[in-house]
UniProtKB/Swiss-Prot annotation:
Pfam family, one: Flu_PB2_2nd
Subunit annotation: Influenza RNA polymerase is composed of three subunits: PB1, PB2 and PA. Interacts (via N-terminus) with PB1 (via C-terminus). Interacts with nucleoprotein NP (via N-terminus). Interacts (via N-terminus) with host MAVS (via N-terminus); this interaction inhibits host innate immune response.
Protein name, per record: Polymerase basic protein 2
Top-level taxonomic group: Viruses
């Protein structure tokens, strides 16, 4: 009432009415800015102004029953005045303090589960070690980094489906949880969050942090794995760095690291096989990393590394459009070129055929320890600005750029012949020949490059052929800068093609990647990598090859047995026996093979000489191309444990030991599995019992297809005929009986009939 009187009073003064009705508000824009929309225009000011009031908060009326009017110090916690425009009460910030100290405690069981990423971070920081602070110039370059430790690698869409299913299971909308990773996560989270009282929106936010990789393009001068990025603000400034060792590892970093190691091993191994692309795919599909299929990780994981990208390209996935040369990632930032074949002469008068890029182009080069910008014309380096951690890294970048420029003085600096080969003993292409040559020794290259006087430019310094810095002179076109070059920020992916030699090209035919670009660095993987492919058996040395070969035969014994009797040549050519050949002394491989194959042929021909253990033991030796000779062997040598060890043709040895009573096979003392000999093998009897219900018709008849094993017979329909393999490696034709009544007589007649059929 009082207020209204006051306003009336004001309005009665003629000047007030005139101002309010006649004058133009010339700053309508300003008024609009501060009065339209619900978005707060100056939040910090608003906050300060609000908090300066006595009761800046509104709360539900129930608060008056739950919080006392005054605290222990006698300060008022809430006002008896109602909030204008709602039926809430005005509350002091002190009430919040009181509530936090004295309010009711609900169950906290869900907090560590919902806020898992925060709890984990606290643990990592608690156990982390912060070292001394060093003051020095920081060469930071922007890289795309993972800012969210401890996440799974779901796509945004997959994560959205999981979150909806966990947090809002009753919402309408079709959600199909299909991927390997979605199902276990959904199940686990539903169980963890039963009866959770935390607001669903908060739970959804936190789940997103756990499920999706979040990347940012940040300036970094050190470690780039997510456990380093989360403390970036503590470990590097503009002119200082603080040493830090994380207090724990997270699975996403471990996966990234192990993926790179697995991919490198696989590409290196595939490159030396007969069909690299097929081998690579076979290995990617049969490898697991930390229990997850490698192909699933490749589909979800955005890691960009040469070997990983080759594997992705082989699977038909898109990869980054930048290309790799000499371990540096090149991204063209401007210009264009056309390719032309040209023959050039090295300083040793060797002719090289190189594909010359004609035209002016600019590139960024980003390596692990150095970065650069390169401007080049046709076979001419115009300018190279390098920055790096140390002299060595800077030199590496300069060599790569000089070779990439294809300048004549570089080609003329070659001393001696270029004959570098890759792991498969094939000659490298000319550009990689040159690169390898100068990576070994770049002295002549730097001496012959040429020197120029330089102007004094801030932040830039010259570099002499012996890699010492100078402010007066520098190698032609080359400068060292304090500033790093940012990594290519785009996450754009392009469609690529790959040939059988694992060369990856973009749609215009430019080679982006090849096995030569895969790093030779060997690390130890954080997660267990399980290579099921026989091609990777040798990665853990000769013993692993030996054990794996025999385990493979035992696991596949049923099929191996049939092939042994039906199509031995196919069996001998199986790729699973390839690694074993490296254990057999080269000079005698052929003789061993000829001997074993002859022995096996006798077993096939002479009834009752079939011997499971002996076949398994000698089979890998039959895989080498055989040499016919009259030589007989009582033992065969394999190179393991740094020396030749003997496998006895008849009987046990430390290498191959079969215990008839326990049925266990041990290879070099390691258990290789259970080996079930065929029944009555020793007594050359017949598996008559197993043939009950079948009538033996006579010798094998090829029209009825390949021989079945005894186990497969059960699938025959009554009256159906089939060839069957019996214990001794002999094949007979049988028919499944139409009536069950005569089964008893089968086993008696079977014995006679088999003898007749075979003889």
């Amino acid at each position: 009432m009082e207020r209204i009187k006051e306003l009336r009073n004001l309005m009665s003064q003629s000047r007030t009415r005139e101002i309010l009705t006649k004058t133009t508000v010339d700053h309508m824009a300003i008024i609009k800015k501060y009065t339209s929309g619900r978005q707060e225009k100056n939040p910090s000011l608003r906050m300060k102004w609000m908090m300066a009031m006595k009761y800046p908060i509104t709360a539900d009326k129930r608060i008056t029953e739950m919080v006392p009017e005054r605290n222990e110090q006698g300060q008022t916690l809430w006002s008896k005045m109602s909030d204008a425009g709602s039926d809430r009460v005005m509350v002091s910030p002190l009430a919040v303090t009181w509530w936090n100290r004295n309010g009711p405690v609900t169950s906290t069981v869900h907090y560590p589960k919902v806020y898992k990423t925060y709890f984990d971070k606290v643990e990592r920081l608690k156990h982390g070690t912060f070292g001394p602070v060093h003051f020095r110039n920081q060469v930071k370059i922007r890289r795309r980094v993972d800012i969210n430790p401890g996440h799974a690698d779901l796509s945004a869409k997959e994560a959205q489906d999981v979150i909806m299913e966990v947090v809002f299971p009753n919402e309408v909308g079709a959600r199909i949880l299909t991927s390997e990773s979605q199902l276990p996560i959904t199940k686990e989270k539903k169980e963890e969050l039963q009866d959770c009282k935390i607001s669903p929106l908060m739970v959804a936010y936190m789940l997103e942090r756990e499920l999706v990789r979040k990347t940012r393009f940040l300036p970094v001068a050190g470690g780039t794995s997510s456990v380093y990025i989360e403390v970036l603000h503590l470990t590097q400034g503009t002119c200082w760095e603080q040493m830090y060792t994380p207090g724990g590892e997270v699975r996403n970093d471990d996966i990234d690291q192990s993926l790179i190691i697995a991919a490198r091993n696989i590409v290196r191994r595939a490159a030396v096989s007969a069909d690299p692309l097929a081998s690579l795919l076979e290995m990617c599909h049969s490898t697991q990393i930390g229990g997850t299929r490698m192909v699933d990780i490749l589909r979800q994981n955005p890691t960009e590394e040469q070997a990983v990208d080759i594997c992705k390209a082989a699977m038909g996935l898109r990869i980054s459009s930048s290309f790799s040369f000499g371990g540096f990632t090149f991204k063209r930032t401007s210009g264009s070129s056309i390719k032309r074949e040209e023959e050039v002469l090295t300083g040793n008068l060797q002719t090289l055929k190189i594909r010359v890029h004609e035209g002016y182009e600019e590139f960024t080069m980003v390596g692990k320890r150095a970065t650069a910008t390169l401007r080049k014309a046709t076979r001419r380096l115009v300018q190279l600005i390098v920055s790096g951690r140390d002299e060595q890294s800077i030199a590496e970048a300069i060599i790569v750029a000089m070779v990439f420029s294809q300048e004549d003085c570089m080609i003329k600096a070659v001393r001696g012949d270029l004959n570098f080969v890759n792991r498969a003993n094939q000659r490298l292409n000319p550009m990689h020949q040159l690169l390898r040559h100068f990576q070994k020794d770049a002295k002549v290259l730097f001496q012959n490059w040429g020197i120029e006087h330089i102007d004094n430019v801030m932040g830039m310094v010259g570099v002499l052929p012996d890699m010492t810095p100078s402010t007066e002179m520098s190698m032609r076109g080359i400068r060292v800068s304090k500033m790093g070059v940012d990594e290519y920020s785009s996450t754009e992916r392009v469609v690529v093609s790959i040939d059988r030699f694992l060369r990856v090209r973009d749609q215009r035919g430019n080679v982006l990647l090849s096995p030569e670009e895969v790093s030779e660095t060997h690390g130890t993987e954080k997660l267990t990598i399980t290579y099921s492919s026989s091609m990777m058996w040798e990665i853990n040395g000769p013993e692993s090859v030996l054990v794996n070969t025999y385990q493979w035969i035992i696991r596949n014994w049923e099929t191996v047995k049939i092939q042994w009797s039906q199509s031995p040549t196919m069996l001998y050519n199986k790729m699973e026996f390839e690694p074993f050949q490296s254990l057999v002394p080269k000079a005698i491989r052929g003789q061993y093979s000829g001997f074993v194959r002859t022995l096996f042929q006798q077993m096939r021909d002479v009834l009752g000489t079939f011997d499971t253990t002996q076949i398994i033991k000698l089979l890998p030796f039959a895989a080498a191309p055989p040499k016919q000779s009259r030589m007989q062997f009582s033992s065969l040598t394999v190179n393991v444990r740094g020396s030749g060890m003997r496998i006895l043709v008849r009987g046990n040895s430390p290498v191959f030991n079969y215990n008839k009573t326990t049925k266990r096979l041990t290879i070099l003392g390691k258990d290789a599995g259970t080996l079930i000999e065929d029944p009555d093998e020793s007594t050359s009897g017949v598996e008559s019992a197993v043939l009950r219900g079948f009538l033996i018709l006579g010798k094998e008849d090829r029209r009825y297809g390949p021989a079945l094993s005894i186990n497969e017979l059960s699938n025959l329909a009554k009256g159906e005929k089939a060839n069957v393999l019996i214990g001794q490696g002999d094949v007979v034709l049988v028919m499944k009986r139409k009536r069950d009544s005569s089964i008893l007589t089968d086993s008696q007649t079977a014995t006679k009939r088999i003898q007749m059929a075979i003889n």
